[in-house]
């Protein structure tokens, strides 16, 4: 048994729900209609922009690694549409519920005003404790990390030793994977949660590897990560992929003074 050599984890493209929520964040609640707020979270589809993002990251991914050993996808419509639009050659996708969206419970697709007025204390905790905060009847980031991410990694350790794996999932699941694979402290997670550079935008790809990208040596644990994300050139209307440098990380060990 052993871990995969490479894991490419991709967030779905822009969805219909993303558009509604973004509008609400700017004070426009006109899209929170009765028809929209009763749509099950699993049923939201990609927008035209989301399909362009998926096509863009798919073409980049093929240029990096044309074929994978294992293809995993969340069963939600927006992730399945993203995976299909990426058009990876010879892909054989396995749907797995472990990759599903974090549960937002009772506040899924409600306005910020409704959230604040109906769940005032919970609304405060969302801002002050984003790692352990749970939406009413929902999941925290820590819940997803300790349960579903660990289940996924255990399964991959049993079934996918030294393989290359591609997964299409959701933003908060990817945050939970980052938390787990990089053994982030609570403080480091909170720092990243507040930083623009760590945002997992639609169709962002986090590539984790056990192979040193500079020397080719391999380790038993994931030790390197590279981020890629689709970026729209507003002048030309074209989508291109912005690729960051590789990051090396290791499990932090703390002294008494550090604690």
Spans of features found by a protein language model:
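Acidic, low-complexity terminal tails and accessory targeting/binding regions
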Residues: 1-10, 16, 20, 25, ...
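Phosphate-coordination/substrate-recognition cap region in phosphate-metabolizing enzymes
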Residues: 4-8, 15-17, 22, 48, ...
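Beta-strand elements within well-structured catalytic alpha/beta cores of enzymes
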Residues: 6-10, 72, 163-169
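A solvent-exposed, charged loop/short amphipathic helix patch at secondary-structure junctions
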Residues: 23-40
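Short glycine/proline- and acidic residue-enriched helix-loop micro-motifs
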Residues: 36-45, 123-141, 248
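Glycine-rich phosphate-binding loop signature in dinucleotide/nucleotide-binding domains
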Residues: 64-67, 156-163
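Internal catalytic-core helix/loop-beta-alpha segment
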Residues: 133-157
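GST superfamily/GST-like fold recognition
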Residues: 171-175
């Amino acid at each position: 048994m052993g871990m995969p050599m490479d894991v490419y984890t991709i967030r779905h493209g822009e969805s219909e729900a993303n558009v509604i929520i973004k509008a609400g964040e700017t004070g426009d609640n006109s899209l929170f209609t009765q028809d929209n707020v009763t749509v099950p979270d699993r049923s939201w589809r990609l927008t035209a922009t989301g399909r362009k993002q998926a096509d863009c990251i798919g073409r980049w991914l093929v240029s990096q690694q044309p074929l994978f050993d294992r293809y995993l996808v969340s069963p939600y419509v927006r992730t399945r549409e993203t995976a299909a639009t990426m058009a990876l050659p010879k892909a054989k996708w396995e749907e797995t519920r472990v990759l599903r969206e974090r549960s937002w419970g009772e506040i899924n697709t409600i306005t910020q005003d409704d959230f604040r007025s109906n769940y005032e204390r919970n609304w405060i905790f969302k801002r002050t404790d984003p790692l352990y905060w749970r939406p009413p009847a929902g999941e925290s980031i820590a819940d997803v990390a300790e349960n579903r991410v660990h289940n996924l990694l255990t399964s991959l350790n049993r079934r996918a030793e030294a393989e290359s794996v591609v997964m299409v999932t959701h933003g908060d699941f990817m945050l939970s994977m980052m938390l787990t694979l990089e053994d982030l402290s609570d403080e480091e997670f909170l720092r990243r949660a507040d930083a623009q550079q760590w945002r997992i935008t639609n169709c962002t790809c986090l590539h984790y590897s056990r192979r040193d990208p500079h020397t080719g040596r391999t380790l038993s644990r994931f030790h390197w990560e590279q981020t890629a994300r689709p970026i729209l050139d507003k002048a030309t209307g074209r989508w291109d992929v912005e690729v960051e440098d590789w990051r090396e990380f290791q499990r932090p060990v703390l002294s008494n003074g550090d604690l």
